[in-house]
C-alpha cells in the first residue's frame, strides 16, 4: 500500500478522496493536531482519511523501529467523526503489521491506563483534546507511561 501525499485538496474532489492529505504543520512537539473540518466550514481540511491511514502506517513502522514491538492500544474521543478517523488509523497500523487492541470510546487517561492493564507498550489516542469541533489529533507513545516527545514526533513526520 502506498500513498501520494498532496499539499492541498478540496473536499469531495477526486484528489481529496484518492490521495493522502496530511499537513506537516500538524505534527507538534508532543502530539499531532489538524483541522479535519465540518460541513459549512470555510477553512480547508489539513487532513483526510487517507492521510490518517498513512499516519497509521508510519506509526506502526516507528513503534517496531524503536523496539516497542507490534502491540498498540487505540481509542477515540466523543466527536462524531473520531471513530472514522480511528478506523483509518487502525487500518494503517495493521497494514504496517501492528496488533491493535482497541478500547473504543475513551478519555486519554483511559487509553494510558489500558497500556498497563493490557500489558501493551504503545498507544494512539484519537482526540482533539480541548479544541473545538472540526479539529482532530492523535496522542501517541511507545514507552509507557511516556508519550512521544520532539524526537519521536520528528521521526514520525
Segments from the language model and where they lie:
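Gly/Ser-rich phosphate-binding catalytic loop and adjacent alpha/beta segment
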Residues: 2-28, 32-157
Amino acid at each position: 500500500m502506498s500513498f501520494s501525499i498532496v499539499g492541498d485538496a478540496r473536499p469531495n474532489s477526486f484528489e481529496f478522496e484518492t490521495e493522502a492529505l496530511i499537513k506537516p504543520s500538524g505534527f507538534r512537539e508532543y502530539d499531532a493536531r489538524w483541522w479535519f473540518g465540518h460541513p459549512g466550514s470555510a477553512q480547508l481540511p489539513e487532513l483526510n482519511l487517507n492521510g490518517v491511514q498513512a499516519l497509521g502506517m508510519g506509526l506502526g513502522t516507528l513503534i517496531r523501529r524503536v523496539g516497542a514491538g507490534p502491540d498498540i492500544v487505540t481509542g477515540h474521543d466523543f466527536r462524531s467523526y473520531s471513530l472514522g478517523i480511528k478506523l483509518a488509523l487502525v487500518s494503517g497500523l495493521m497494514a504496517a503489521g501492528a496488533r491493535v487492541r482497541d478500547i473504543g470510546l475513551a478519555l486519554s487517561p483511559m487509553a494510558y491506563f489500558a497500556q498497563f492493564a493490557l500489558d501493551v507498550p504503545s498507544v494512539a489516542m484519537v482526540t482533539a483534546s480541548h479544541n473545538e469541533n472540526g479539529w482532530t489529533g492523535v496522542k501517541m507513545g511507545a514507552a509507557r507511561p511516556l508519550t512521544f516527545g520532539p524526537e519521536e514526533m520528528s521521526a514520525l513526520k
